[in-house]
From Swiss-Prot:
Protein name from the UniProt record: Cysteine--tRNA ligase
Motif ('HIGH' region): 30-40
Cofactor binding annotation: Binds 1 zinc ion per subunit.
Keyword set includes Hydrolase: no
Upper lineage: Bacteria, Pseudomonadati, Pseudomonadota, Betaproteobacteria, Burkholderiales
SUPFAM superfamilies, A to Z: Anticodon-binding domain of a subclass of class I aminoacyl-tRNA synthetases (SSF47323), Nucleotidylyl transferase (SSF52374)
């Protein structure tokens, strides 16, 4: 049976959807004002693995992941670049989708945009106001009265007294309490017209937290079976969501809360605010990038390496980014593909009941989506395939890899893609990229001719030349030679 660590209860619990066989899952998505970085990649891949395993377990999943398309950061980007809000958001939504496709992230069943649900947000604000949980401030904003919600802090484990001790009301603030947060922001004269909506409170726009309360309730109803997001959303965003939704409607917002761990860089979380981020496209693009093109050419070997780098780590554990860690991930993924290349698969599906590695894979995934343990089962199968040449083991390896969104490329084509993350490339300036496929095939043909002429010294010299350039040859029965980049 599947068990999930619930941030709310701080324990691992048996997962029981509110409606048998059906899962309503909401994940907080991107604020689209810039390119996605590797920390975003971790969240996207982590919850992609979650929804894949839920479906593989026979559950019907309604997966909603929102887009925040109105926000202070978006407004700043539009003003800085002289573009309309919609131009900014459409471009970065397209860029995000390109990143997701590159990483093998399946699209959510529904992907609502905040600006499509302003009416529903105003309805919730009205409910909160009628219950004394929201008030109109002197500056025209509508704020949530945190003091009126007794359970505030239950998700993050923070008490109101502790929170208030670290807060001060800013000079000129219209808040009654320093912890109160904005539900509706009054329009400012200097802000673009396409950031303003009519409301009972005058022209303005929604606060960030109210957006997810409206979209999750409208599309999935209450309670959600799973609500997820990145590590920095637990507080205040998800805490505020609970206060809004439960304050307005009563009952639980979500039965299970999931948060993936942070991606770390030198002991700090990767984030745009710290300036220590690397974008997804910088990491896996094939060729130059343009700031005017949302789409880009993807190196499929490097893209799968990045997904593998994320999947091999448990989603809740902090993960460290360093170039050498990507090299290690590339080498490990190459070993799995080498096993696939050495032996043809039998084409059979996964036998969960008979195969020990499949059972180990399932046990790991049922234990809070432990993809790290599942990857260990893949290496057991690869080891068996290399040791015995078992077509069954290779078939299981490919089928189980598919559950994690891995190992679906054609092995010869995979190895023919250059990579910046091999040990040779890191140490010698990517020599493997110096020869293109046509040049490599020509050298292989020369070697074959030398072997046919029994000039084995020449054949060995060509192999050595290619190896020095980062190209490994694999001679197969019947005179066929396959190649791969080291």
């Amino acid at each position: 049976m599947l068990h999930i660590y619930n941030t709310l209860s701080r324990t691992k619990e048996p997962f029981k959807p509110a409606h048998a066989g059906q899962v309503r899952m909401y994940v907080c998505g991107m604020t689209v004002y810039d390119y996605c970085h590797l920390g975003h990649a971790r969240m996207l891949v982590a919850f992609d693995v979650v929804q894949r395993w839920l479906r593989a377990s026979g559950l019907a999943v309604d997966y909603v992941r929102n887009i925040t398309d109105i926000d202070d950061k978006i407004i700043r980007r539009a003003v800085e670049t002289g573009r309309r809000i919609g131009e900014v958001t459409e471009y970065y939504i397209a860029a995000m989708h390109a990143d997701e496709r590159a990483l093998g992230v399946q699209p959510p069943d529904r992907e609502p945009r905040a600006t499509q649900y302003v009416g529903e947000m105003l309805d919730i604000i009205g409910r909160l106001e009628s219950k004394g949980l929201a008030y109109r401030a002197e500056d025209g904003d509508v704020n949530y009265a945190v003091r009126g919600f007794a359970d505030y802090g239950k998700l993050s484990g923070k008490s109101l007294d502790d929170l208030r001790a670290g807060e001060r009301v800013a000079v000129g603030s219209a808040k009654r309490d320093p912890l109160d947060f904005v539900l509706w922001k009054s329009a400012k004269p200097q802000e673009p017209d396409d950031t303003k909506w009519e409301s009972p409170y005058g022209l303005g726009r929604p606060g960030w937290h109210i957006e997810c309360s409206a979209m999750s309730k409208t599309l999935l109803g209450l309670p959600l079976d799973i609500h997820g997001g990145g590590p920095d959303l637990k507080f205040p965003h998800h805490e505020n969501e609970i206060a809004q939704t439960e304050g307005a409607f009563g009952g639980a917002l979500a039965n299970v809360w999931m948060h993936c761990g942070p991606l770390m860089v030198d002991a700090d979380k990767m984030s745009k605010s710290l300036g220590n981020f690397r974008t997804i496209r910088q990491t896996i693009a094939q060729g130059p990038l343009s700031d005017t093109q949302a789409e880009y050419a993807v190196n499929p070997r490097e893209a799968e390496m990045l997904r593998f780098f994320i999947v091999r780590n448990h989603y809740r554990s902090p993960q460290n980014y360093a170039p050498d860690n990507l090299v290690d991930a590339q080498n490990a993924l190459d070993r799995l593909y080498q096993a696939l290349q050495n032996t043809a698969a039998d084409g059979q599906g996964v036998d969960w009941s008979e195969e020990p590695q499949a059972q180990a894979f399932k046990a790991a995934m049922d234990d809070d989506f432990n993809s790290s343990g599942a990857v260990a089962a893949l290496f057991e199968l690869a080891s068996e395939a290399n040791r015995t040449g078992s077509a069954r083991a290779v078939g299981q390896l490919k089928a189980l890899g598919a559950v994690l969104g891995l190992l679906q490329q054609d092995p010869p084509a995979y190895f023919q893609s250059p990579t910046r993350y091999s040990a040779a490339a890191r140490g010698q300036g990517a020599p493997a990229a110096a020869l293109d496929a046509a040049a490599i095939e020509a050298r292989i043909a020369e070697r074959a001719a030398a072997k046919a002429a029994r000039d084995f010294a020449r054949a060995d010299a060509i192999r050595a030349e290619l190896r020095a350039a980062g190209i490994e040859l694999d001679d197969k029965p019947g005179g066929l030679t396959q190649w791969r980049r080291a």
